[in-house]
Design a protein with these regions (language model features):
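Beta-propeller blade termini and top-face loops
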Residues: 1-186
């Protein structure tokens, strides 16, 4: 399973991802598929500490509800494209705890596989507010909740006090209060 993103009013173009931040753009009308990964690296058997970016096995991909030509993708940082993935801009610093001692090969010391997708200190969920363009919420697999209210220029750690390390796997912006979000930590 992985994230999929598309324009609900015109679902012909679909973005889908896999491990290591691989992301494809698929055109349902033509059947064509094209890799649009931000940084062309396939780091099988490369320790995450030696990679440019760290991606969760299921790295978030979303389209903006305000401009469907804008897509976001996340690793340990957030990327933005306004041209359907032809070019990308990094719009955040590392939003994780960036614990280098946990960036061993194959996900070590937590998992011991060599597929290259077992990274830690990654963004596991990303959403843009439907109330206001440029308000993005990001959750990580190390329990951090971050928000930007200016399209990524500035990010604030808004992790509630007392929350321990955990995987943030869902963020829903309140439909009634644009400054609040509901978060699931597991």
């Amino acid at each position: 399973s992985a994230f999929l993103a598309f324009d609900p009013d015109n679902p012909v173009i679909v973005y889908g991802g896999t491990y290591q931040g691989n992301i494809d753009k698929w055109d349902a009308a033509t059947g064509e598929s094209k890799s649009i990964k931000q940084y062309p690296e396939l780091g099988l058997s490369v320790a995450p500490k030696d990679s440019k970016y760290r991606y969760n096995w299921n790295a978030p991909i979303i389209t903006s509800p305000h401009d469907r030509n804008t897509i976001y993708h996340a690793g340990n940082v957030v990327f933005k494209s306004t041209d359907e993935g032809q070019s990308w801009t990094t719009i955040s610093p590392d939003l994780t705890r960036n614990e280098i001692d946990k960036h061993g090969p194959g996900g070590g010391p937590y998992t011991n596989e060599a597929a290259g997708g077992e990274n830690y200190n990654t963004i596991t969920y990303l959403t843009e507010s439907t109330h206001e363009e440029g308000v993005l919420w990001a959750g990580t697999d190390d329990g951090l909740l971050q928000v930007t209210r200016d399209g990524g220029s500035n990010w604030t750690n808004v992790t509630p006090v007392g929350i321990k390390d955990g995987i943030i796997n869902s963020i829903e912006v309140s439909p009634h209060n644009p400054t609040a979000a509901y978060v699931v930590v597991m």
